[in-house]
Amino acid sequence: MNNSFFRKNSKIYIISGNLKGRKISFKNIPNLRPTTNQIRETLFEWLSKYIKNSRCLDCFAGSGVLGIEAISRYAAFSTLLEIEKKTFLTLKKNIKELNIYNVEIIRTNTLHWLKKTRNKPYDIIFIDPPYHQGLVKKTINLLENKKWIKKNSFIYIEQEKKQSIIVPKNWTLYKKKITNQIQCYLYICST
């Protein structure tokens, strides 16, 4: 096993934009797997024409790297949802150290928040939940049924390999990448 797993804290770096090279610290806790540099680079290359001035929602923020990377690449705003207290507190600390103000961090159960909160739809939504908990399907259903998505919204899904995925008929697959361990999909809402 990788020795970094046993360290109390780890860090990843923002790979592009006005925060390029800045670090994001995170606690090594079960189920926290920040999206790798390679996958993030691919994802944000896919989104490069659409990220500027977008409103982003990071449904299971964890390290917050997806929402923060979006801000670094000139997204207008990111909402980060995280339930785990230590991870949430680390996220708050990172946002303060990065001196960014167009990020909202909410300590909440993502499914509960999507069900109960009223907000306007997001342009880009990141879904990268803990594995083996059936959260992708539940999140997709809430995003669609509670009108969190609008025409031309992008929805990024990262999940363990060999898990099936069923999306609404009005979502069109825009890009996909499959590695040894994960599968990544970027959909666009057509209606």
Swiss-Prot record:
Per UniProt, the enzyme's principal EC class comes to transferase
What is the catalytic activity of this protein? guanosine(966) in 16S rRNA + S-adenosyl-L-methionine = N(2)-methylguanosine(966) in 16S rRNA + S-adenosyl-L-homocysteine + H(+)
Keywords from the named record: Methyltransferase, rRNA processing, S-adenosyl-L-methionine, Transferase
Enzyme Commission numbers on file: 2.1.1.171
- One Pfam match: Cons_hypoth95
GO MF terms held by the record: 16S rRNA (guanine(966)-N(2))-methyltransferase activity; nucleic acid binding
Family, similarity comment: Belongs to the methyltransferase superfamily. RsmD family.
| PANTHER family given in the database record | METHYLTRANSFERASE
Record's function text = Specifically methylates the guanine in position 966 of 16S rRNA in the assembled 30S particle.
Q: What is this protein called?
A: Ribosomal RNA small subunit methyltransferase D
Species of the source: Buchnera aphidicola subsp. Acyrthosiphon pisum (strain APS) (Acyrthosiphon pisum symbiotic bacterium)
